[in-house]
């Protein structure tokens, strides 16, 4: 069942007489519980696509439907509610609050989500229950990224959006993070969408969307995606 549907979506930026089509007439759909990779070079439109799906921006043309709701028609307040209730975000840089402990960083989302899950349970799920009272500066990069994933999951989102989640990590830690994200799709029914320029990560995906110059070049379904351990780094 499709949880996400883009129909003829464009995002156009203007400056004087100049017009930039960051996305140009994009259409695709995604089923619930899939591990999706959006692949393309820098400037292809990947992050614009992710921002639109995450409710951080609105399309200039077309419609974006998530769980039956056309989010392209939502007001600013309604988009804020959508971001709080439906999507979780994981970025390349972890955006943890340095003066809060691990537990406090994760628990923080319970203040904006009415259906938040237990913070300790999410921290345990990412394997860092022993670090509840540590501050971000006391963690490795991989540990900080896992905490950012725990924080996103604590919101109990339908969709987990990840922008280059392994970009700042070494290969061993990157594999660990990808295993965790893959598990969220396979065993917890989350729709996980990863934006990356790393073609190796695409080998793990149920669906690969290739983007170039603001256009969808292909949407490929992979029947037998590789595990993170099988991908050559």
Regions found by a protein language model. Name each.
Residues 215-233:
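Conserved beta-strand-loop-alpha-helix hinge in the C-terminal portion
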């Amino acid at each position: 069942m499709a949880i996400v549907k883009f129909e003829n979506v464009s995002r156009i930026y203007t400056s004087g007489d100049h017009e930039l089509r960051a996305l140009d007439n994009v259409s695709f759909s995604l089923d619930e519980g899939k591990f999706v990779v959006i692949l393309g070079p820098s400037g292809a439109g990947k992050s614009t696509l992710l921002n639109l799906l995450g409710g951080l921006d609105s399309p200039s043309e077309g419609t974006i439907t998530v769980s039956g709701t056309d989010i392209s028609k939502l007001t600013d307040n309604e988009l804020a509610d959508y971001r709080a209730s439906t999507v979780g975000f994981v970025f390349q840089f972890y955006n943890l609050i340095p003066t809060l402990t691990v537990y406090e960083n994760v628990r923080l989302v319970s203040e904006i989500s009415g259906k938040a899950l237990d913070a300790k349970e999410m921290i345990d799920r990412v394997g860092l229950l022993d670090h509840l009272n540590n501050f971000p500066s006391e963690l490795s990069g991989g540990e900080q990224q896992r905490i950012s994933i725990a924080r996103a999951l604590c919101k109990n989102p339908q969709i987990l959006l990840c922008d280059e989640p392994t970009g700042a990590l070494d290969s061993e830690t990157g594999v660990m993070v990808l295993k965790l994200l893959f598990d969220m799709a396979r065993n917890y029914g989350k729709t996980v969408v990863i934006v990356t320029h790393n073609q190796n990560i695409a080998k793990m995906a149920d669906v690969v969307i290739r983007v170039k110059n603001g256009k969808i070049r292909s949407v490929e379904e992979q029947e037998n995606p590789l595990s993170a351990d099988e991908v050559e780094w």
